[in-house]
């Protein structure tokens, strides 16, 4: 893997990319003197600006003072050169004067790619360079610069005035003209522009404010030196990594704070997000957000250049994580106005003086006047631009929440004593702003979640398809235009890609945090969604729900929304009383996350290499001291210190130290690991450095990891397809894909049955017309269920979570005329005339279902007869042509309910519902005499009941309590690899729902699903720990779950945040076991890997306490007992000291392979199972040399796992039951060493077992079934 030669290492840049001084040229100033003498200052008020000086890092070179041990490969990559002749005789690499490029004194200066020096003067003086007769106040404004690749850099410009006096010597210290009285009354503007890769608007404004105090006092020939010194300081300040650590630097006289981004997915927010709320009413804010969401051509106007960029950036920040991807030029100078004629979407800004000119000349623009708080459209475009309204309920909630904000710091600070310290007062204001920013981000994110929450219901993740047509059907009529425009944007397309890629960004986190219990339950359902009775009732009760789907009444304009007792402008003065609307939008109580400050050491002489190295040394020392003071629970903060220290070691040329610091990020926060920088660092190392790194175990693994991951072929950025009906004939595989894309059903096995039904009696392919008819039938049934109008009295008879799935036509029954309705639980009659409710039967109580006929005059009318257990009278309904279908459907639901009750598995009812609805659609599609016979192919449970009725054994039924399906919603079941139960606890750091007990379920490829064990609903739907098989899980302390993987990594999951941001990479082969002491709060965890390595870890610090290597490989698991580590290998069980000395060996009596073992200290027993045999062996711990006692497991073909529960051993495997192979559990009585119970657990092998507080045992099945069973412990 060694590189043939060290490569150039481009070091990460600091805050500064470029610093420039701009103003009028020397020739212009000479002319100004002459004009001013003749005509006065007013006649010479306008000059042409240009770049006078450019300062680009690095400001010190290796030649100035080489650091011992620094790699010769270190250096800055050159991006673009700018050549100018200089008037000074001495060459300086950090500075350039634009001018004549001819002559021998020209040089190269590296200019950042996103900075166009030709356009920079116009942007730094967007109005003009105006000479003044008296000094003016300093003026700061902000720029966003974009290169041809779309990469943005950010500029902060400070304009200041200097007198044009008699010894003007700005360039080289020489006087150029004679003193004059008039020139002394001239004040000429100059600008200093700082360009950074990071949008530190407030921070860089503070820095420039400090610089201006020096520039005003210095002499002309000293200006460049001051700016150069200032630029060098900024270039040495690193950008803080994402997270809670902010950096603070003493710029004198101000302490300047550089905030970090909240997380790697979030932008840096260093501006006052409430500025738009001071300038626009909330309704206008929504309108502007809509313009951005629909990607209009937008132009901001203001008489204050500074507000243009700040306002545009605020609105873009409001829409995070959605991103504006088009042209973004917040400031246009007068010479750039033709930019607004661009035909594509853009967001630009102009001075208010140009408002009328732009309005008249350009068509189709949205014009936003910041000064007057108005939003209008340019000429002759009112008919062309249709700015739709945000959905009404979301708009009302947003407005109420915005009006509840306190937008004035004076109100917050009124009760505080006056600050006598400048920086203390600034810190107070900053804390207030941080809290307000957090609330505003929360409000806008809630708006986005409300707008797009249900998009996920119409996504197919397997084939990356979005069914926009069906999504639009679920939107209210008045919201159609809004969604149609939004769905057609690049912004929304990128949002869809992020959802399909499973990105856990701010949107996904809030969606998860705010989902209702019903949403959590819905995620576990495999049957199609329908509105519940409770939702139907609330739809009727609430007048706000008049906007529900398929309404024909249009929405009112957003501007017309009236909210009682909420005056629009008062919101910025005080907290509003929102008691009237509290039920729908309570006042937010958002607490920003805790942040920490780290003070950067002073940089005394930033242009001297030795002083710069001393600064790096001081910085490293301060970081190391801060790290030493941290407690074991401060891993997030520790990670930031490691990151910064790693960067500083790179600057010092200490590559090995840098890599060791970056390697520590695996144990503290892998989320900020700079993989690309580490890879480039390794590539830049000399042969000797690389060899030294390879000799360090931690770095050897780090290098392998980074190069392996980067060696993988980059995944294609798969586009999102919009669902379309097929246009060609489909074979089985294509049909499966199309049905999954449509969102009708995902389970491939069910789709295979559907294929057989639709092709019954025909060639085994489906034509486009049949598919279209089937899809239409399905969607029409879905729409009918959405529009069912149920009488109010019905709510008293049905459960709140029941849904009406099917309604018959109006029929005559022996209990009245009406429509038969089917829910997942029962059949009932909706009587006509006077609306009423007559219960027919619950599926549990059905005793018999018959399809017969009754005579009427000369006709035989098909009739459905249903007999129930509790009632003597048989229900009869003259269903006529619908009779055969209802007969099939009722029998399938009855069979599904019986299976659900027998197996304690509600998923059977959900699957029966899916089968029933598919039957209905098949009959509606085929409309032929054979349609019913074709539909019967889908009556899976009824057919199974007829062909091979299997009674659940009594012992199994009595012990089994419940079953859950972690693979619900997947295309096929997945094997359960490992289960872990963690008890609930009420921790101040946890939300109430987080305090519930949890069940952690590891599926294939590193997927982990977390269930709330108090309700068995999904708590966290599938996150990843690597991409390999999970072998073991254990709980450490109360907030960590450790996961051992086949890829040799231990992943650590934070229980509070449900994130996996730590990894232990010390093992070199698959991690096979994790063990903790049985104490309440284990301080140590032992891990083992297949190669025989055993490592003891400190849980708090994640440091290795001890490690040893067994001479035997194939280490399968470990257990702790009596200060010894018991190790199970394939061939032996070993008793080992914590130091790694083997004290005892236990061999298999038949030279077979061990599979697992369990220790029972109270009974002084050791139980072991073997691979491929159906016997258990029990040794006495008193004398392991004695031959073991053997127990034979009847009808067992394989043992796969075993656990100890109280005074029992539960053994999982597979064996015969009623002539078929099933997953089985044997419960062993440890005293009698006999089988106490034999449980028929699953359709597939029992793969794993775990105990829940010794009250329940949970078993996980193989891939054929993929379910979890919950068993009561006697």
Curated annotation (Swiss-Prot):
Asked whether the keyword Cytoplasm is assigned, the reply is: yes
Q: One Pfam family, short name please?
A: DENN
Task: Name the residue ranges with Basic and acidic residues bias.
Answer: 89-105
User: Could you state one GO cellular component term attached to this entry?
Assistant: cytoplasm
Q: Where is this region: Disordered?
A: 65-108
What are the start and end residues of every segment in region (Linker)?
A: 520-970
Where the WD repeats fall, as residue ranges, is: 975-1013, 1019-1055, 1059-1099, 1103-1140, 1146-1181, 1186-1228, 1234-1273
Provide the positions where the record notes the PTM Phosphotyrosine.
940
Q: What is this protein called?
A: DENN domain-containing protein 3
In this chain, composition skew of type Basic residues spans 76-88
Tell me which residues make up the cDENN domain.
268-400
Name the encoding gene, please: Dennd3
Intracellular or extracellular location(s): Cytoplasm
Keywords in alphabetical order:
Cytoplasm, Guanine-nucleotide releasing factor, Phosphoprotein, Repeat, WD repeat
Q: What is known of its domains?
A: Inactive Dennd3 is found in a closed conformation, in which the linker region interacts with the DENN domain. Phosphorylation of Tyr-940 in the linker region intereferes with this interaction leading to an open conformation and enhances the GEF activity of the protein towards Rab12.
Annotated effect of mutating residue 940 to D: Abrogates the intramolecular linker-DENN domain interaction and enhances GEF activity towards Rab12
What does the entry give for GO biological process? endosome to lysosome transport; protein catabolic process
**The uDENN domain, residue ranges:** 75-245
Q: Does the keyword Phosphoprotein apply?
A: yes
> Per UniProt, what is one GO molecular function of this protein?
guanyl-nucleotide exchange factor activity
The chain positions of domain dDENN read 402-506
- What are the annotated disulfide bridges? none
The protein's assembly and partners: Forms oligomers. Interacts with 6 of the 7 known isoforms of 14-3-3 proteins.
């Amino acid at each position: 893997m060694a590189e043939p030669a060290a490569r150039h290492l481009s070091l990460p840049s600091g805050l500064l990319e470029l610093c420039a001084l701009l103003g009028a040229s020397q020739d212009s100033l000479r002319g100004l003197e002459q004009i001013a003498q003749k005509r006065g200052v007013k006649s010479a008020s306008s000059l042409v600006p240009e770049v006078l000086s450019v300062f680009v890092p690095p400001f010190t070179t290796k030649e100035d003072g080489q650091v011992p041990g620094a790699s010769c490969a270190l250096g800055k990559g050159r991006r673009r050169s700018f050549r100018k002749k200089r008037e000074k005789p001495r060459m300086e690499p950090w500075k350039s004067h634009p001018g004549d490029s001819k002559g021998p004194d020209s040089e190269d200066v590296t200019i950042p790619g996103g900075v166009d020096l030709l356009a920079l003067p116009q942007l730094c003086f967007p109005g003009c360079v105006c000479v003044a007769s008296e000094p003016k106040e300093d003026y700061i404004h902000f720029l966003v610069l974009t290169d041809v690749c779309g990469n943005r850099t950010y500029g902060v410009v400070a304009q200041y005035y200097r007198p044009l006096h008699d010894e003007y010597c700005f360039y080289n210290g020489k006087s150029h003209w004679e003193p004059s009285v008039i020139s002394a009354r001239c004040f000429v503007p100059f600008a200093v522009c700082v360009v950074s890769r990071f949008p530190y608007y407030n921070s860089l404004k503070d820095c420039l404010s400090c610089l201006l105090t020096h520039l005003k006092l210095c002499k002309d020939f000293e200006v460049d030196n001051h700016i150069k010194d200032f630029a060098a300081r900024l270039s040495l300040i690193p950008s803080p990594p994402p997270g809670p650590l902010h950096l603070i630097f003493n710029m004198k006289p101000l302490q300047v704070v550089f905030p970090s981004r909240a997380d790697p997915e979030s932008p840096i927010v260093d501006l006052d997000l409430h500025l738009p709320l001071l300038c626009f009413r909330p309704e206008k804010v929504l309108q502007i957000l809509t313009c951005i969401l629909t990607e209009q051509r937008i132009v901001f106007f203001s008489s204050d250049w500074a507000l243009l960029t700040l306002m545009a950036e605020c609105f873009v920040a409001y829409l995070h994580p959605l991103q504006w991807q088009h042209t973004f030029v917040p400031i246009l100078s007068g010479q750039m106005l033709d930019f607004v004629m661009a035909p594509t979407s853009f967001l630009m800004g102009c001075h208010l003086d140009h408002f009328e000119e732009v309005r008249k000349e350009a068509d189709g623009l949205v014009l936003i006047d910041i000064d007057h708080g108005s939003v209008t459209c340019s000429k002759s475009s009112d008919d062309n631009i249709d700015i739709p309204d945000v959905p009404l309920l979301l708009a009302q909630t947003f407005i109420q929440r915005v009006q509840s904000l306190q937008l004035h710091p004076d109100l917050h600070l009124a009760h505080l004593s006056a600050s006598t310290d400048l920086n203390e007062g600034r810190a107070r204001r900053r804390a207030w702003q941080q809290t307000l920013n957090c609330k505003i981000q929360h409000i806008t994110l809630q708006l986005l979640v409300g707008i797009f929450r249900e998009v996920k219901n119409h996504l197919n993740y397997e084939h990356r398809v979005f069914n926009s047509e069906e999504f639009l059907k679920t939107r209210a009529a008045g919201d159609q235009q809004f969604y149609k425009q939004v769905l057609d944007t690049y912004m929304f397309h990128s949002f869809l890609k992020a959802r399909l890629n499973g990105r856990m960004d701010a949107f996904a986190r809030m969606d998860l945090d705010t989902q209702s219990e019903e949403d959590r339950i819905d995620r576990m359902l495999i049957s199609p969604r329908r509105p519940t009775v409770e939702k139907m009732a609330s739809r009727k009760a609430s007048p706000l729900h008049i906007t529900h789907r398929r309404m024909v009444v249009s929405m009112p304009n957003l501007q017309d929304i009236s909210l009682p007792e909420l005056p629009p402008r008062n919101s910025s003065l005080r907290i509003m009383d929102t008691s009237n609307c509290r039920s729908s939008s309570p006042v937010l109580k958002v607490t920003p996350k805790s942040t920490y400050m780290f003070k950067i050491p002073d940089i005394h002489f930033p242009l001297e290499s030795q002083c710069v190295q001393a600064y790096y040394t001081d910085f490293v020392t301060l970081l190391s001291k801060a790290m030493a003071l941290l407690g074991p629970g401060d891993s997030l903060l520790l990670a930031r210190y490691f990151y910064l220290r790693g960067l500083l070691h790179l600057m010092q040329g200490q590559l090995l130290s840098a890599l060791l610091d970056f390697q520590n990020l695996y144990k503290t926060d892998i989320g900020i690991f700079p993989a690309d920088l580490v890879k480039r660092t390794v590539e830049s190392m000399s042969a000797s450095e690389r060899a030294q790194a390879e000799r360090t175990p931690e770095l050897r693994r780090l290098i392998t990891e980074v190069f392996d991951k980067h060696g993988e072929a980059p995944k294609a950025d798969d586009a999102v397809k919009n669902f379309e009906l097929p246009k060609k004939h489909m074979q089985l595989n294509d049909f499966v894909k199309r049905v999954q894309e449509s969102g009708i059903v995902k389970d491939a096995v069910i789709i295979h049955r559907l294929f057989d039904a639709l092709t019954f009696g025909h060639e085994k392919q489906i034509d486009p017309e049949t598919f279209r008819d089937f899809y239409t039938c399905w969607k029409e049934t879905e729409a009918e269920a959405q529009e069912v109008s149920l009488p109010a009295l019905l709510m008293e008879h049905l459960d709140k979570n029941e849904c009406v799935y099917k309604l018959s036509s109006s029929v005559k029954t022996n209990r009245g005329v009406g429509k038969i309705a089917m829910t997942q639980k029962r059949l009932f009659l909706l009587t006509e005339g006077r609306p009423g409710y007559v219960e027919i039967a619950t599926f549990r109580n059905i005793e018999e279902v018959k399809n017969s006929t009754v005579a009427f005059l000369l006709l035989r009318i098909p009739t459905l007869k249903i007999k129930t257990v509790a009632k003597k009278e048989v229900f009869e309904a003259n269903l006529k042509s619908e009779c055969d279908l209802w007969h099939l459907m009722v029998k399938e639901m009855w069979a599904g309910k019986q299976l659900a009750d027998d197996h304690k598995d509600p998923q059977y009812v959900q699957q029966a519902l899916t089968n029933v609805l598919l039957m209905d659609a098949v009959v509606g599609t085929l409309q032929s005499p054979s349609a019913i016979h074709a539909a019967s192919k889908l009556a899976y449970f009824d057919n199974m009941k007829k062909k091979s009725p299997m009674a659940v054994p009594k012992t199994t039924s009595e012990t089994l309590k419940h079953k859950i399906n972690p693979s619900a919603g997947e295309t096929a079941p997945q094997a359960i690899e490992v289960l872990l139960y963690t008890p609930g606890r009420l921790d101040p750091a946890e939300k109430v729902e987080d305090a519930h007990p949890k069940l952690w379920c590891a599926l294939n490829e590193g997927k982990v699903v977390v269930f709330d064990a108090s309700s068995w609903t999904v708590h966290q739907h599938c996150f990843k720990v690597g991409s390999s098989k999970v072998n073991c899980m254990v709980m450490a302390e109360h907030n960590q779950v450790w996961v051992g993987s086949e890829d040799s990594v231990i992943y650590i999951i934070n229980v509070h945040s449900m994130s996996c941001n730590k990894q232990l990479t010390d093992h070199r082969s698959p991690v096979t076991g994790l063990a903790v002491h049985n104490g309440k709060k284990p301080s140590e965890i032992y891990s083992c890997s297949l190669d025989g390595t055993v490592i003891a870890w400190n849980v708090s610090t994640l440091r290795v306490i001890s490690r040893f290597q067994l001479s035997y490989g194939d280490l399968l698991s470990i257990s702790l007992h009596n200060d010894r580590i018991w190790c199970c290998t394939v061939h032996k069980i070993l008793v080992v000291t914590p130091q790694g000395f083997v004290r005892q060996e236990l061999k298999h009596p038949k030279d077979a392979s061990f599979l697992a073992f369990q220790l029972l200290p109270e009974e002084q027993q050791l139980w072991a199972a073997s691979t491929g045999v159906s016997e258990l062996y029990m040794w006495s711990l008193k004398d392991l040399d004695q031959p073991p006692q053997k127990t034979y497991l009847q009808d067992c073909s394989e043992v796969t796992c075993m656990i100890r529960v109280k005074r029992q051993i539960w053994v999982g495997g597979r064996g015969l039951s009623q002539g078929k192979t099933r997953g089985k559990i044997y419960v062993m009585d440890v005293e009698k060493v006999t089988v106490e119970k034999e449980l028929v657990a699953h359709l597939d092998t029992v793969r794993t077992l775990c105990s829940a507080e010794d009250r329940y045992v949970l078993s996980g099945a193989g891939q054929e079934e993929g379910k979890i069973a919950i068993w009561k412990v006697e």
